[in-house]
Amino acid sequence: MLLVLIRKIYTIQTKQMNSTIHIERLALHCYHGVMPQERIIGAMFYVTLHIDLEVKDEAILDDNLAGTVSYADIVQSVREEMSVSSALLEHLAYRVGHKLITDFSSIKSLNIRIDKENPPCGVNVDAIGVSMSMIR
């Protein structure tokens, strides 16, 4: 009875609930880069995502995964796309973001950042990265 009452109040007060999923510095060893040795040796890449999506009542009121997106499914999609070699981080970030928006219909927008650890750029730098925003 109480859950029914809460659901009625929630439905009256909100038409749509949005949420942001944060995945910070997902670490993956991958083979991306302009130089041939980068595609042979590989490097550590760190993917950070801020994903805005619509959350349904099942997740908020019923504690049911069916009302949102599984973090594990997001990570799996990122891993799949990161396994395909690219020369440019810009191209890679676009591909990963596009895959997520394509795979998960509840995603409204996302911000993606991909950092490459110790890139071969002639200077001592911890990482170089690219950020990109995408809207459905």
Protein language model annotation of sequence segments:
Residues 9-136:
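N-terminal, polar/charged subdomain of small-to-medium soluble alpha/beta proteins
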